[in-house]
Amino acid sequence: MKRIAFTAIFTSALVAFFPEFARAQVAEASAATAAPLSAARLAGQGVLRFLGFEIYRARLWVQPGFDADNYAAHPLALELTYHRDFAAEAIAKRSIEEMRRVGRFTPQQATRWQQALAAALPDVKAGDRLLGLYQPGAGAVFKMGGRVVGEVSDAEFSRLFFGIWLSPQTSEPGLRQELIAATRTAGQGQQ
């Protein structure tokens, strides 16, 4: 209880004596909750767990008219907040494995895509927030901390990559349902 009181008093003092601190806190909170696409809304969120351990929290942002059954026809943003540290190479390798569940591609494509994804992504630490942006017929753009950290300019890669979370063939159907929850309740998609 004393710790809570001290924290409240300390924060109040910072705000009173350093108003720019308050503005920075509000700006940071606004940036963290702002929609990453124009006119987008949060469709759903969920946590990926493996053997009971939280791996990341996923949040899906979509525009009006999004149809989960035809996700690849719509712009979207997928935000992952990691609960563990991962090397970019490990993320890329696992992504290719998961993409194989979604669709077919050649070994040459797998090699090219894994290399491109490993180069596009940063290593992540617990607490890092990575945002993937999808535009139909285009590649994937990845942002961290509000800046572009990489991209993979291949439309087929992008469709399969976001299919890891959104395709009916995903290895995590429960997480998919959580991500598209608001699109179902809004009557914009059925799966």
Where would I find each of the regions flagged by the language model?
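Terminal leader/tail segments of proteins
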Residues: 24-191
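Positively charged n-region of N-terminal signal peptides that target proteins for export
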Residues: 1-3
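Bacterial N-terminal signal peptides
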Residues: 7-17
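General helical structural elements
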Residues: 6-7, 180
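Sec/Tat signal peptide C-region and signal peptidase I cleavage site
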Residues: 18-24
